Amino acid sequence: MPNIRIIAIFAVIVIAAVAGLAWPFISTMKFGYIMEPVQASQWHMGKGSEYTPEMTYQVTLNQTTFLADMKFLPVSQGAQQLLVKINPGGGASEIDQTVPIGLVYDFVDVSAPSKPYFDVLDQSVFSMRDYATEAKYLAKDAEWGDLYIGANAEKLKVTDSGKMSFKFGSADAYLLSYRIGAKMNKIWIVDNLPLPVKAEIYDPDGNLQYSYELGSLKAPSTPGLIS
């Protein structure tokens, strides 16, 4: 019995010593977002496009403001196209352009009249491709990616959710945000709609870089919408 007691005491001492040596390393480790909300829905660019919604945005970038009506056409032979109608305003004629939809929503083969507007859409509505070509969780505090602004690193994450009001109506939505200087940059997502429904993005000096909002939505087949 004395030998067993000595062995037990020695084992406790060894465990304590190992824990003491390991603690400085464990305590300095940075753990990421490892508890995935497995019950939450997920979203990616293009999710819900098969329901062929028609989404009309007001888009502003710098001094350019216009309306963009985007109709997701039915899938044909495994491919899908997007019909975009640009209304430049100011009495200018509407510009129509049909483009094939790819994974990253990068439309380079467009007509000369529509190119300036597609360049704006590329920097605004379609820019969500940088963070969500793969499925991301729609849950509070879920992280969607890292942003590097100058010497600072920020995380894009879900900061709010619930029923929210927009120009097109109300819907259960998810707010993603990150800070640049004194400004919070915000992007709103509605599950089963293939593009973000709203965004307000600022530059490091606090100036509005671009904004857009879904003003009209025709999506009778899209599940889960609340109007």
Which role fits each region the language model picked out?
Residues 1-18, 24:
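N-terminal Sec-pathway targeting helices
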Residues 2-5, 22, 100-107:
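Poly-acidic low-complexity segments
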Residues 4-6, 27, 63, 111-115, ...:
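Polar/charged alpha-helical tracts
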Residues 18-101, 144-227:
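Acidic, serine/threonine-rich low-complexity disordered tracts
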